[in-house]
Amino acid sequence: MSARFGVVVFPGSNCDHDAYHAAHDVFDQEARFIWHEEASLGDVDVVIVPGGFSYGDYLRSGAVARFSPIMQDVVRFAEDGGLVFGICNGFQVLCEAGLLPGTLMRNESLRFVCKDTPLRVENAGTPFTNALTEGQVITIPVSHGEGRYYADEDVLARIEANDQVLLRYSTADGAVTDEANPNGSVHGIAGLVNEAGNVCGLMPHPERCVESLLGGDDGRLIFESLLNHVSIVAA
């Protein structure tokens, strides 16, 4: 089971090394950094658009990064069916680039939120969640100031009807409540995929919890899902 990971790096990215560490050091996969000024992704199986504050979050989170030269090839790769995984700021970039529906707004509290967060699995049938089970509750940390997912009613209805929601913020026993929602995201949405299922945006940080030494390793399940999918496709 082997996959080639490309981790996109923008000015202001600060979770790129965490994503690289998870793929290369923890899972022993081929991985490399891809600078924002590059024109081609090269030979990769999975593109990770990592967290951080790309371009200082000027204008709004992800708004400048989506115009980086490398994003043209990220869009091309996604449209060709390649796996693209946006984490936190990466989620914001993918929404700005039109690869995912909706947008991310300032947290309802107007405060930065950084804590471990229980998440209920809604769809375990995607390349990003196949190592999980529907209804399972996992815990992954969040760390963001603009993580409130929003879409209009028509878009939300389509997302829900297509089973595009992967994870929702929940209590430890799986109840989706306002109190369990750290940022005010509509429908408690923490992560979702595009209609084709090959592009994922996730506000929590699975790359920060792939080793039990750090207090939890539920994030491993996301990376294991990606490796499972790549292995099946390669076969």
Curated annotation (Swiss-Prot):
It is found in: Cytoplasm. Keywords: ATP-binding, Cytoplasm, Glutamine amidotransferase, Hydrolase, Ligase, Nucleotide-binding, Purine biosynthesis. Residues 5-235 form the Glutamine amidotransferase type-1 domain. It holds the Pfam family GATase_5. PROSITE patterns: GATASE_TYPE_1 (PS51273). Its EC number is 6.3.5.3, 3.5.1.2. Its main location: cytoplasm. Part of the phosphoribosylformylglycinamidine synthase complex involved in the purines biosynthetic pathway. Catalyzes the ATP-dependent conversion of formylglycinamide ribonucleotide (FGAR) and glutamine to yield formylglycinamidine ribonucleotide (FGAM) and glutamate. The FGAM synthase complex is composed of three subunits. PurQ produces an ammonia molecule by converting glutamine to glutamate. PurL transfers the ammonia molecule to FGAR to form FGAM in an ATP-dependent manner. This is Phosphoribosylformylglycinamidine synthase subunit PurQ. It comes from Salinibacter ruber (strain DSM 13855 / M31).
